[in-house]
Amino acid sequence: MNFNYKLDNEVLIVSLEGRLDTEAAVKFETELAEVCKANAHSALTVDAAELEYIASSGLRTILKLAKTEKNFKIVNVCSSVYSVFEMTGFARIINISKALRKIDLEQCEKIGFGGNGAVYRVSEDEIVKVNYNPATDAELNSELAKAKEAFLQGVPTAISFDLVDCGNGYRGVVYETIKSKSLGETIQNNPELMEELTDKYIAQLNLLHSIHTANPVFGSMKDNYRKQVENASKHLTEEEGKMLEMVLDALPEGDILVHGDAHPKNIMIQNGEMLWIDMEGMSAGHPIYDLISVAAILSGVRNDDKMTMAICGMDVATVLKFRQCFVKKYFKTEDPEMIQRYDSMIEALRLIRAVFAIGFNSQNTPQMRPLIIQVARQAFFPNIEKIVGAVKYLVNTL
């Protein structure tokens, strides 16, 4: 077996090649000890991309490293070697990650896009959601974990498979292909089904919100909003930052499972069944967080049909009709006065989502931020008492 090493920002990276059998393990342990002694480091990473085999003696060498090195991990492990780590329990006590499957995006059809990436069709049965923003790569692992756990909790979701290497430093998550259209697109193409589909959509929201969870994989939705306030406040006056804090204070913690971006393009219809997609924001919280995300699209996007279609699958006119239908059915009222009252609250929630976007971690945020701040100063901050009041009322009502 051969190995080489390099020091990168105090991380000692050791690359293995060949077979770590009994003879090789003794030699490797001795030589690596000298390398570690001669190169001051704060972390040790073993790159096992070219490691073909590991014997029990090799495992013991790895275990010694895990015990003596403060920040130790093994990356790019092939399937056969990873299975050894799994069977022996090493994968439970050491930070070990498998080599990612590689996908060539040039051979895939681009079928969608978003703030931090795009969606490509890998095959008839698989799509890959690619992240173009390396700063948020860590969120991909979180998204995969959330998608799998939500499925196990009984949430109707697209089945997630694995994390993949998409080339050029990009990572992605592979999902099953949903052979149908989104709820938004279905309503757009079948307006006569709007009422029926809205009923089913609300039933899916209620099903999701019937699930209580303490699983740490989901995290707190209020914490997510808190981070947005912290980021947004850097671009606002002190007084404006305090107004965002007023909204944050009115938003509750909770243990109810919420999607975080529950608009009609994030729910697909396949063989009559509605399935949630894009679950990176799924967290524990309160139904108002999903109502905020729905409200965000209920006026269309800047009265622009093309942009509105891209975001939620419907044109502006259809969105406005859907808004009326949704408000009546979600709040279970036919009273015109109550409908108008709830509609004004939806507008307040829409403004919250828009203004909190000042603190989003998206590639598009820097160019959009000046416009959002302008809108905030025209419509949000002057009406802060009304907006906070709407939040408090809905928190107690939902």
Locations of the language-model features?
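ATP-binding pocket architecture of kinase catalytic cores
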Residues: K110-P216
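An alpha-helical support segment within catalytic cores of ATP-dependent transferases
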Residues: S210-G260, P264-K265, Q270-N271
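ATP/Mg2+ or Mg2+-diphosphate-binding catalytic cores
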Residues: E337, I352-L398
